[in-house]
């Protein structure tokens, strides 16, 4: 399984458009391939397009990492792995437990847009 993870240069997990790096964890080869995110500071949809083009099977997400558009782009094409972890290292340390919790869909609050109150 190839699992996409979006993070910054300090390897802290970030929403799609804030991620400087797209990591692809290849759990069979036990490696993380890193790609510079060409859609950094653009949009979540642009980053999702890159992830889909790379050929990921799943993506690690936290609340508001996705938006309705990027979720719809990936729905049926990726599995979703929700996490409370904050860094690539933590994801790697808990990869087996995270993989076992992969789902085909997300609750709306995970991908809903954040609106200031």
Which residues are covered by each model-predicted region?
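Non-catalytic interface/targeting segments
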Residues: 1-42, 53-54, 80-117
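Mid-chain, well-packed structural core segment of small domains
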Residues: 52-89
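Short beta->alpha connector loops
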Residues: 40-43, 64-66
């Amino acid at each position: 399984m190839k699992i996409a993870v979006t993070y910054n240069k300090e390897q802290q997990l970030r929403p799609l458009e804030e991620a400087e790096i797209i990591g692809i964890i290849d759990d069979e080869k036990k490696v993380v391939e890193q790609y510079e995110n060409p859609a950094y500071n653009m949009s979540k949809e642009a980053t999702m397009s890159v992830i889909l083009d790379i050929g990921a099977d799943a993506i690690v997400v936290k609340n508001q990492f996705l938006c309705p558009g990027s979720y719809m782009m990936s729905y049926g094409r990726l599995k979703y792995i929700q996490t409370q972890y904050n860094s690539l290292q933590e994801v790697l340390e808990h990869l087996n437990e995270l993989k076992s919790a992969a789902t085909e869909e997300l609750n709306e609050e995970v991908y809903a847009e954040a609106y200031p109150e």
